[in-house]
C-alpha cells in the first residue's frame, strides 16, 4: 500500500484565468482542428467533440444531427449489422466521416465490427470501449484490432494514468479515452472506491500521449460548456460528452410519462437498466456501476450543440486564443473553492 500526496483536481476545482486578447468577436475563433493520426496515418478535420457511445446518446439520429456541426458521434455497439447497413444506405459520406464504430473486446464483438467496417470504406474510426482499460486482455485486443485494421483510426479506453496511456498507444491506439468514474450516471467510484479526478487525469495522460505522438479524449465529468473548455485547456485533443447530450429528440432513450409530464430515461452502460436490456440482467458475480435518471425532454440537440460551441468560442476569446488549438497554450488554471453564484439556482 502507498499514498500519493499530490492533490488531484476535477473541473469543479479550477477556473481559467482571463488574459489580454486581440480578438474582436467570438466569431473570430476557429474551433475546427486538423489531425493526422499516429498509426492509421489518416487525416481528419472537424470540431473535436464526440457524442458518447451510450445507447441513450450515441444513436444514428444523433450522428446525423451532430455531423452538421462537424461533431463526431461514437455510435453505440448494440446496433445490428443490418441496422448499420440501413443507416449507411440513407447517409451521406459527410455524415459517415463523423461516425465512430464502437466495439467491446469479445470475439463476437470483433467479428461484428469487422462486418460493419466492410460495409463502407468511409467508416474510418473504431472506438474500443471497456470500463477498465488496465487488463492485459484489453491491450492484446487493441493490438489485434490494429493488425486487422491498419488504416482505421483506433480510439481505446478507459484509463486515467500516463503509463497505461503509453501502453495503449504503443499497442496501436491512435487516441486514448481518459476517464474512470466521472460520468453523470456512473457509480464506479462509489461502488469500487476506484477513480481519478478528471482534470488531473487529462493533464497527465495528455502529457504522456503527446510525447509518443498519440492523442487523448477526455471522457466524462463535463456538466457545462465551461467544463468542455477546461478539458481542452488541460490538453485534451477531443472531449466526449454523454449527459450533456442526453434527453434530446435524437438521444434514443425510452420516454416515460409522470403526472402529465414526459421524461426520457438516461442510464450508465454498466447500470442495471443497461444490463437488463442487453444481457438479460446483472450477473450474480458483479454489481451495477451506473444509475438511471429521468430527464425532462430537451428538444432537438442542435440547440445544445450551439450552446456548447458558443461557450467554447467565448472561452477562447477570454484568453486570446484565435483557434481551439491555441487554448491549451493560453490556459492558466487557478484553484478555487467556488464556481458560480448560486442564489437563484433553485427558482
UniProtKB/Swiss-Prot annotation:
The organism's place on the tree of life at top rank: Bacteria
Alphabetized InterPro entries for the sequence: Aldolase_TIM (IPR013785), GMP_reductase (IPR050139), GMPR (IPR005993), IMP_DH/GMP_Rdtase_CS (IPR015875), IMP_DH_GMPRt (IPR001093)
Binding site for NADP(+): 108-131, 216-239
GO biological-process terms attached to the record: purine nucleotide metabolic process
Coiled coil: none
Listed Gene3D superfamilies: Aldolase class I (3.20.20.70)
Gene Ontology CC: cytosol; GMP reductase complex
Catalytic activity: IMP + NH4(+) + NADP(+) = GMP + NADPH + 2 H(+)
Active site: 186 (thioimidate intermediate)
GO molecular function, a single term: metal ion binding
Ligand binding (K(+)): 181, 183
Pfam families linked: IMPDH
Keyword list, A-Z: Metal-binding, NADP, Oxidoreductase, Potassium
Family of the protein in this entry: Belongs to the IMPDH/GMPR family. GuaC type 1 subfamily.
PANTHER family recorded: GMP REDUCTASE (PTHR43170:SF5)
Known partners and oligomeric status: Homotetramer.
Function statement: Catalyzes the irreversible NADPH-dependent deamination of GMP to IMP. It functions in the conversion of nucleobase, nucleoside and nucleotide derivatives of G to A nucleotides, and in maintaining the intracellular balance of A and G nucleotides.
Full protein name: GMP reductase
Source organism of this protein record: Shigella boydii serotype 4 (strain Sb227)
Gene: guaC
Amino acid at each position: 500500500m502507498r499514498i500519493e500526496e499530490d492533490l488531484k483536481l476535477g473541473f469543479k476545482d479550477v477556473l481559467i484565468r482571463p488574459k489580454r486578447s486581440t480578438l474582436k468577436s467570438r466569431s473570430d475563433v476557429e474551433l475546427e482542428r486538423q489531425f493526422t493520426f499516429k498509426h492509421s496515418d489518416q487525416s481528419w478535420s472537424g470540431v473535436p467533440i464526440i457524442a458518447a457511445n451510450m445507447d441513450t446518446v450515441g444513436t444514428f439520429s444523433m450522428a446525423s444531427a451532430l455531423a452538421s456541426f462537424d461533431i463526431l458521434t461514437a455510435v453505440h455497439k448494440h446496433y445490428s449489422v443490418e441496422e448499420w447497413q440501413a443507416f449507411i444506405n440513407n447517409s451521406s459520406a459527410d455524415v459517415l466521416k463523423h461516425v465512430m464504430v464502437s466495439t467491446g473486446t469479445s470475439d463476437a464483438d470483433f467479428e461484428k465490427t469487422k462486418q460493419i467496417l466492410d460495409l463502407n470504406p468511409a467508416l474510418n474510426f473504431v472506438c474500443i470501449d471497456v470500463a477498465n482499460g488496465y487488463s492485459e486482455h484489453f491491450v492484446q485486443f487493441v493490438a489485434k484490432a490494429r493488425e486487422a485494421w491498419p488504416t482505421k483510426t483506433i480510439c481505446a479506453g478507459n484509463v486515467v494514468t500516463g503509463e497505461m496511456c503509453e501502453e495503449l498507444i504503443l499497442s496501436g491506439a491512435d487516441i486514448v479515452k481518459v476517464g474512470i468514474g466521472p460520468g453523470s450516471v456512473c457509480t464506479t467510484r462509489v461502488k469500487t472506491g476506484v477513480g481519478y479526478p478528471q482534470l488531473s487525469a487529462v493533464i497527465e495522460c495528455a502529457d504522456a500521449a503527446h510525447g509518443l505522438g498519440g492523442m487523448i479524449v477526455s471522457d466524462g465529468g463535463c456538466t457545462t460548456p465551461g467544463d468542455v473548455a477546461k478539458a481542452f485547456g488541460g490538453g485534451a485533443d477531443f472531449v466526449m460528452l454523454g449527459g450533456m447530450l442526453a434527453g434530446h429528440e435524437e438521444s434514443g432513450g425510452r420516454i416515460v410519462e409522470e403526472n402529465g409530464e414526459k421524461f426520457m430515461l438516461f442510464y450508465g452502460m454498466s447500470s442495471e437498466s443497461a444490463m437488463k436490456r442487453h444481457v438479460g440482467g446483472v450477473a450474480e458475480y458483479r454489481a451495477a456501476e451506473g444509475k438511471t435518471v429521468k430527464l425532462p425532454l430537451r428538444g432537438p440537440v442542435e440547440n445544445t450543440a450551439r450552446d456548447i460551441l458558443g461557450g467554447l468560442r467565448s472561452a477562447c476569446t477570454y484568453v486570446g486564443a484565435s483557434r481551439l488549438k491555441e487554448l491549451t497554450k493560453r490556459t492558466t488554471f487557478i484553484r478555487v473553492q467556488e464556481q458560480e453564484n448560486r442564489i437563484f439556482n433553485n427558482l
